[in-house]
A protein has these predicted regions:
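Short amphipathic beta-strand starts and helix->beta connectors
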Residues: 21-30, 73-83, 114-117, 138-145, ...
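Acidic, proline/glycine-enriched N-terminal capping motif
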Residues: 1-81, 90
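Residue-level signal for inorganic ion chemistry
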Residues: 46, 96, 134, 157, ...
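Glycine-rich, small/acidic residue-mixed loop/short-helix segments
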Residues: 2-5, 84, 198, 206-210, ...
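Anionic-ligand-binding alpha/beta catalytic cores of soluble enzymes and soluble regulatory domains
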Residues: 158-237, 241
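Short, intrinsically disordered, mixed-charge
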Residues: 54-62, 108-116, 228, 256-259
Length: 312
């Protein structure tokens, strides 16, 4: 089972839990904090590594050695297999990292198109990712791989577990606090916001992960066609703020007028906004800001659909 963010909440955290989260959240949002994130790592190496990845990934792979870039691995139909980071570690070697637990899926997809290619693909064991987040992240970890997101700046320190240590003086924060900040910023994760039903433009990840000047790659046709039509897609990833304190479950239906128009993918309690917040895919007919109702078996609550990020 792939690693995903903390289990969905079933109730608003109590006072003690909120107090424990407050300092961690403040560090990640307003200062600098570090979280140990579950990530998987693959090594792609060999004389054909560059040309092979150039034909498989949405991003330009000719980056300088020692640098990285965000990219997508897509199905031929243009649906998402993985959002990953391409790290060039040598002239003929790359390390790919992505949300933990998805290595088998990524390896299977890469191997499916690896025909007469002089390059090996192997899972790298024993590596870790320390996510340094907050306005002070780049200063605290100047050698990290960029992991900035609108309203949520940061860098990641990746490498063998014994060699990657938290920056001195940076607060170690809980995954739960990171999850709140992630949802507020609209950072999608695999298994929740990203799966094989998602078109990249729906998730708002095209700008950070796609090159429109490189050559052909698997899945390019749909990405290019949508871009040529102004990026119009049937639904988009949106932020949702509950009007009250009732915590809806993941999977709750977004209802507007007399229609079901979306579904929640991630939910957390935001102390900063004083309400539950969520990510969810919402039909394009519902333009933010918009009043909606969230419905699930045994409950419902009013909410507001907003553009991301929810907190900046």
């Amino acid at each position: 089972m792939p690693d995903v963010p903390p289990p969905p909440l079933t109730a608003v955290p109590d006072t003690a839990e909120l107090a424990n989260l407050a300092d961690d959240y403040a560090a990640l949002r307003d200062g600098v904090g570090v979280v140990d994130l579950p990530r998987d790592f693959l090594r792609v190496a060999g004389p054909d590594a560059r040309s092979f990845l150039q034909g498989q990934l949405s991003q330009q792979v000719d980056v300088p050695v020692g640098t990285s870039a965000w990219s997508l691995l897509l199905h031929p139909q243009g649906k998402v297999v993985a959002l990953l980071r391409l790290n060039r570690t040598g002239d003929e070697e790359y390390i790919l990292d992505f949300d933990g637990g998805w290595a088998p899926t990524v390896v299977e997809r890469l191997n499916r198109f690896k025909l007469r290619v002089k390059a090996g693909i192997e899972v790298v064991e024993g590596w870790r990712c320390l996510a340094v987040r907050g306005p002070g992240a780049h200063e605290a970890a100047p050698g990290g791989a960029p992991a900035d997101w609108p309203g949520f700046p940061g860098v990641d320190l990746i490498g063998p577990a014994g060699e990657v240590e938290p920056p001195a003086g940076v607060r170690a924060c809980s995954p739960a606090a990171y999850e709140v900040a992630r949802i507020e910023a609209g950072v999608p994760v695999m298994g929740r916001e990203l799966d094989e039903s998602v078109i990249p433009a729906e998730a708002g990840i095209v700008d950070v992960s796609v090159s429109f000047t490189k050559g052909c790659y698997t899945g390019q046709e749909l990405v290019a066609r949508i871009d040529s039509r102004g990026g119009n897609v049937p639904r988009r990833l949106r932020g949702i703020v509950v009007l009250g304190v009732t915590l809806p479950p993941e999977g709750a239906v977004v209802h507007a007028g007399d229609k079901d128009v979306g579904v929640l993918t991630s939910v957390a309690w935001s102390a900063r906004l004083g309400a539950p917040v969520a990510l969810g895919y919402v039909r394009r007919a519902v333009e933010p800001p918009a009043e909606v109702e969230l419905r699930w078996d045994g409950g419902s609550v009013a909410a507001r659909v907003l553009a991301l990020p929810l907190v900046s």
